[in-house]
């Protein structure tokens, strides 16, 4: 069994609380499960995701376990084939988001014309809503795309709380687990696999 891990497990406060109060504690808890599952379950991170996580944790507290239990591997981008429908879906999704972002901007302009004393607040609201319209539910970084490609290459399960990653995993037929239940999954695996030689 193979898992490809996203940063949300260790960094997103809503998800991380299942593993620890801060990113380092969350990683320590995860590594304790990885140690019990060593040789039976593999945990991967693309290099970009690994670097991202390392910005949030105290690496000195986590070595050598983090190097032993998390396999850093980039996807083989020169060999992987992506179905054409993915490109069609992406183009259509981007077009919808641009239109939605335009409507958000138009609404903000109308509000600013009516309420000229409150322009700064309207701009903040515009930025927040524009960002939500364009980025929520889409793969919006190279690191997110690497995560999906690596899971596809390895026939692994993605672990993430990112709606965009999970949406595209579903579209591409990739197995996934929401980060919010990952600790329960690990506990179940430890219970099932303890003492078994797989």
Swiss-Prot record:
Question: Keywords assigned by UniProt?
Answer: Endonuclease, Hydrolase, Nuclease, tRNA processing
Which reaction(s) does its UniProt entry say it catalyses?
Endonucleolytic cleavage of RNA, removing 5'-extranucleotides from tRNA precursor
Write down the InterPro entries for this protein, in alphabetical order: PIN-like_dom_sf, RNA_free_RNase_P
Its BP terms in the Gene Ontology are:
tRNA 5'-leader removal
Listed EC numbers:
3.1.26.5
Task: List, in alphabetical order, the Gene Ontology terms for molecular function in this entry.
Answer: ribonuclease P activity
Superkingdom, taxonomy of origin:
Archaea
Check the record and name the PANTHER family matching this protein: RNA-FREE RIBONUCLEASE P, UPF0278 PROTEIN TK1425
Query: What is the recorded function of this protein according to its Swiss-Prot or TrEMBL entry?
Result: RNA-free RNase P that catalyzes the removal of the 5'-leader sequence from pre-tRNA to produce the mature 5'-terminus.
Report the family membership.
Belongs to the HARP family.
Q: Cite the NCBIfam families for this sequence.
A: PRK04358.1-3 (NF003342), RNA_lig_partner (TIGR03875)
Protein name (Swiss-Prot/TrEMBL): RNA-free ribonuclease P
Q: Which organism is it from?
A: Thermococcus kodakarensis (strain ATCC BAA-918 / JCM 12380 / KOD1) (Pyrococcus kodakaraensis (strain KOD1))
